[in-house]
Structure formats: C-alpha cells, structure tokens
Amino acid sequence: RMRLLTCTGAPSPRRVTLYLAEKGIELDTVEIDLKSGEHLSDEFQAKSPECTVPVLELDDGTSLWNSIAIRQYLESLHPEPALLGREALERARVTQYVLWIEHNGMMSAAEAFRNAAKGMADHALPGRRPVPQIDALAERGVRRFGHFLEDLDGFLDEQGYVAGDAFTVADIDALVMIDFGCRVTKAELEAHANLSKWYERVRNRPAIRAEG
C-alpha cells in the first residue's frame, strides 16, 4: 500500500494533506518527528535525499519526495475533481502560479524562518550538511514575503482564484504559505483587501475547514 511520510502542520506536508482532503483521497500516514531529527537519519535520507517531508512511498518501494511531484502523481490516479487544471493552458497556468508561490512565498518565508529560529542553528538550508544562519537573509526574507503578499493581492484583483476562475492547488499553496509566512514574519493579511477576501473564502471550504 502507498503511504505518506509526513509531519502534521509543517508547510510542505500541509500542501499535500489539504490536497488529499479536497480530493477525498485516504492514505496510510507515518508521522516523522522533525524535532528529534528523525528526518536526518540515514534511513530517511535513503527515501528523501534532501531530508525533507512529505514523502510518498509507492507499493514497489519507489519514493516521491517533493510536494508538487506527489500531487502530480496522485492527480493521474484520481483525476476528479481536477485540481491541477483540465485543459493544456489551464494546467500550464496552475503550474506557473504554483512555482511562483514556491519561489516567492515559500522561499522567502523559509529564508526568514531558517535564518532566525534557534532550533535551526546550523540548519539554515534543508539537508544534513551544516549551513550557518545569516541575520541579513532573515531580514530579507521578511521583506520578500511582504512583496509576495502585495503581488498576490494584485493577481486577485483580476481573478477569483490564484490561477484563474477555478480553485486549484495554487490556492492550497497560497493558503499554506500565508499561514506559515504571516506567523513567521508577523505580516498582516488585513492590509491586503483582495487577499483577505480570497483567504476567507478558501479557508471556509469544507475540506479545509475540517482541518481544524
């Protein structure tokens, strides 16, 4: 059986668990204890070269260790409801926004968090190699995340959802990054009218609201 190695509440795993909830897919799950460093073990690195969660283990032992890749694989098995787009252009637009969120939202919030959190000393980047924290990068991450919110608010001035007129994984990723990034950087969502309206609408979707 397929199983998902995850850590409840962490941003990247949440991108997959909310996707599963929206699709109505149930998988066996295994909790990985990040605080104890379980993800840095030889055994886990054999499954995930970057020592990151989530990881989807397939029936034959193959591992997928990237949130985007995991969702693409599951979408091929469970095409409805379509969350990665239907037609070629729609799929391309969803991918475009998912990558934009990854580069501008996830990376900026991670930059702010990993370079400032005490528990991340010598782990400013994923993986087992020691990487020192840099205060200036934490400060830059805070600024970059603010720019991310401004730009996303602008996108939502023209369309109902992040990638267009339909709810997709781009909305899931934006929600996850906002929850994580606003907590890390102390940014205030209320300063962005379009974003605030979109957030309330998405946050109140039944599958997402059920998360608790």
Give the role of each language-model region.
Residues 2, 202-205:
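Intrinsic structural disorder
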Residues 69, 73, 93-96, 147, ...:
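Non-catalytic alpha-helical scaffold/packing segments enriched in small hydrophobic residues
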Residues 210-212:
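Short, flexible loop/turn segments with low-complexity composition
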Residues 1-132:
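GST-like domain detector, emphasizing the conserved glutathione-binding G-site
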Residues 101-203:
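GST-like fold's C-terminal all-alpha helical module
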